Amino acid sequence: MKLVHKDIEKDNAGQVTLIPDEAEDMWHTYNLLQVGDSLRASTIRKVQTESSTGSVGSSRVRTTLTLCVETIDFDSQACQLRVKGTNIQENQYVKMGAYHTIELELNRKFTLAKKVWDSVVLDRIEQACDPAQKADVAAVVMQEGLANLVLVTPAMTLLRAKVEVTIPRKRKGSCTQHDKALERFYEAVMQGILRHFNFDVVKCILVASPGFVKDQFISYLFKEAVRQDCKLLLENRSKFMVVHSSSGHKYSLKEVLCDPAVTARLSDTKAAGEVKALEDFYKMLQQEPDRAFYGLAHVERASEALAIDILLISDTLFRHQDVATRGRYVRLVDNVKENGGTVRIFSSLHVSGEQLNQLSGVAAILRFPIADVSEPEENSSSDED
């Protein structure tokens, strides 16, 4: 993401102009947008035209519209973002107040205006515009006949390909059908790696499976690389790391990222940091439950006592449409930072973020124990989106 212009007033109102230059930037933009914001961007509009003879036709024209945002739709698989709202600036093709849907496009600038830019949103822009934040981890999570090829970016886990091949069972005295199917499977996974992983960006490729599938695949991969003289694989052999997983399903990625050897190698990545923070929280919950709180009301009380060492909070909560509730989450983040605590904002598109959402989306590891906190009168579930 490129920041073209930023104009924020002292009262925190203002606008920014950004250019999304890769698919992940659409996810960042989705997290910036809120109902009531003003979005100005280039778009295509179908307009009716009347010729001199009176015949009516229609054509598609490119124009720039400014919408008051009403609905925001993000497709996480295609990384497409559509924003629907009403036109709030005069335009030769679209009447004031008319509805339109803008699909934001890569490499086309847009301007977003808000009445209040809070610290969480401004941090998100800083993160999105940091060139160091790229998809530098890839993973192949596999078992016999199934492989998920995944990119782990700082903001999301992207499933790039799923390989499924039926593997017949070994028969007594003959393994031919089984072995041929297994070879077809390994070949398909190899082609998937070459097609979907950018070796110029990826620093590490995790190959994970139960049993010996991962080892057999790596052996096949580099034998084939030598046979086919595939320099791309041979030159990047050191980037491959073999680790254990309980299955070939995508959810096993969490346990892969928890592996101490993996954690050490990926110590500088945001995704690994999120996984470790959640693991530390669960350990604390088991060993010292008075130092592990979750749920907004309980975590707020810990924050008031200046007790929070690490705050774990899901980005889902900052998309809450109720301004007052969203404000509580923003104040919580600001208070923890002001009092020397660490804030980790989890992406709901990471496995760890999905897990945190099951714990209400907000949790904290405390500096010191706080005795049993009585249940708040309000139902904390009403605080969640």
From Swiss-Prot:
The answer on whether this UniProt entry bears the keyword Cell cycle reads yes
UniProt-annotated location(s): Cytoplasm
> What is a single cellular component term in the Gene Ontology annotation?
cytoplasm
The record's similarity note reads:
Belongs to the eukaryotic release factor 1 family. Pelota subfamily.
Q: Which Pfam families match?
A: eRF1_1, eRF1_2, eRF1_3
Question: Is Cell cycle set as a keyword in this record?
Answer: yes
The record's listing under Gene3D superfamilies reads:
3.30.1330.30, eRF1 domain 2, Pelota, domain A
Role description: Component of the Pelota-HBS1L complex, a complex that recognizes stalled ribosomes and triggers the No-Go Decay (NGD) pathway. In the Pelota-HBS1L complex, PELO recognizes ribosomes stalled at the 3' end of an mRNA and engages stalled ribosomes by destabilizing mRNA in the mRNA channel. Following mRNA extraction from stalled ribosomes by the SKI complex, the Pelota-HBS1L complex promotes recruitment of ABCE1, which drives the disassembly of stalled ribosomes, followed by degradation of damaged mRNAs as part of the NGD pathway.
Where is this chain primarily localised?
Answer: cytoplasm
Cofactors named for this entry: a divalent metal cation
Q: Name one GO biological process term.
A: cell division
Q: How does it assemble?
A: Component of the Pelota-HBS1L complex, also named Dom34-Hbs1 complex, composed of PELO and HBS1L.
Q: Which SUPFAM superfamilies match?
A: Dom34/Pelota N-terminal domain-like (SSF159065), L30e-like (SSF55315), Translational machinery components (SSF53137)
Give one GO molecular function term.
Answer: metal ion binding
Q: Which keywords does UniProt give here? A: Cell cycle, Cell division, Cytoplasm, Metal-binding
Q: Which organism is it from?
A: Danio rerio
Per its record, how is this protein called by name? Protein pelota homolog
